[in-house]
Amino acid sequence: MKELDRLLDRIIQRVNINLRELAYDVSPLVQKLIPFNQMTKFYAFYGITPHHPLNLQFRNSNLAGSYFLGKCSVTNSLLYKSDIRGDELKQKADTFKYQEYEIPLDEDEEIEIEDSFLIKTLVHNFSHDPETLEKFFIKDTISTHYANIHGSPSNGCFLGPFSTVDLTTIRDCLAGTFSYIQAGEVSHLNIEPGTVWVRVPDTFNFMYRFPLQRLSNYIYFTAGNSPQGIFIDFVEDRKEAFQRVFNVVNLEPSVSVPSSASLDRFAVIKPKTHISENVLVSQRAYLQNAWLGKGANAQEQSYIINSRLEGNDITAHGAKIIEADLGKDVFVGFNCFLRGRPESRLTIGKESIIMPHTIVDIHKPLSIPAGHLVWGLIADEKELESNSMPLKDFAKIDTRFSKGNMVFEGSGAEFVTAFKGRIRHILEANGAFFNGHSNKGHAQQNQNISFNTIQPYPQGEKEGLFPTIIIRP
């Protein structure tokens, strides 16, 4: 495994060079975070469909347990159980609109991963940077457990566990544990753990910071240790269910799936689960006694347990919904943790927006009214009051406003409009509005994927490295 050692040292050095202005050394956090014997045990796999351009290139890298779809190149990198999902990449002749510009693409977009270490990380969407529309790059970057790199080119960064960088070009930055950044473009920043930051320059700025002592019950990460807390325990308790999914070659769906819906081969479906028309269930999703109404979706690393989603509900990447009832058109953002109890269920009214990285963890029944914006850390009615607002009231904000640990500046109307527009786009992209003839999306186009596996050198100096592989039509 000497080559894996050299490769990790190379990646650590390159990231440290990029972070030198922040005086940050990633080595104590990363060394031995994933034992190398784990990185030799798992195959990688890729999907082929008639809808997505195929061009995969792997050089001098480990890809253990990782999944690839669409155009992607990986060079001098370590990818452990990560999902590189290129089904939303822009294609040749597409036009990208940015401010007053309409920019045509000369070639298909490609995800380009170089000198990076991604651990159980999701890479999805497409580059929103007008300077690099055809290259969704991830370079000199280390991303730890259950982070999301969503439409966010990254160079010289460290992403803590359960962090999300969303629609943001990020350079030479630290994204702290459980932080969420959607800010357009950032560089040379140390973003503290538990920060939720949504910004459109000159339009609005939403900022919330979790109380770190309480957040540490859910997730904390220190040098020399693996991530720990309720989030990790929750996932680890259900890990065995995924082992069967990945060990069996041919696995028939255990539930009825309508012809307009898509159930990924690598999702876990437990008994008493119902899937309606136009539903999308992505790889590594986990459903148990879950009722998904028409147009609902469960994205990567999401968990829906003993819960009912009435329809057109979005469960974003990494979100967890337990013992809850959601009305129609509810958005649950990245890495949310919504947990009711069997005798104390959580109810969320229709058309509500649960901000990314929101924690609702209750021991008494709690009802969130329809049309509300919710954020922060909520354990009871009192905390719901200080961490939520009706969307119609939030839209009236036109200056600085604060409530609890949340501070907002700018136009509330623009904020609400932007969120609603994005929710509409997600539903469209996922095929929620398919009518039998038009408006196809992932739920319809991801139904027929053929999967192929690739494996690393089994022993010798190159043990754990995958050979150079180029896969083209």
What are these regions (language model features)?
Residues G70, E109, L251-P253, R265, ...:
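Short, conserved secondary-structure segments in the cores of folded domains
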Residues M1-R10, R14-I17, S27-P50:
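Extended low-complexity, polyampholyte segments enriched in Ser/Thr/Pro and acidic residues
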Residues G464, R472-P473:
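Transmembrane alpha-helical segments and their membrane-interface loop/helix boundaries
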Residues P258-N289, G293-G295, Q299-E300:
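Beta-propeller domains
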Residues A44, H52-F58, D237, A241-L263, ...:
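Eukaryote-specific, low-hydrophobicity, charge-rich regions
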Residues I11-P28, D83-I138, H145, I149-S154, ...:
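Glycine-rich hexapeptide-repeat left-handed beta-helix
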Residues T40-F42, Y46-A64, F68-L69, S73-L78, ...:
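Extracellular beta-rich repeat passengers
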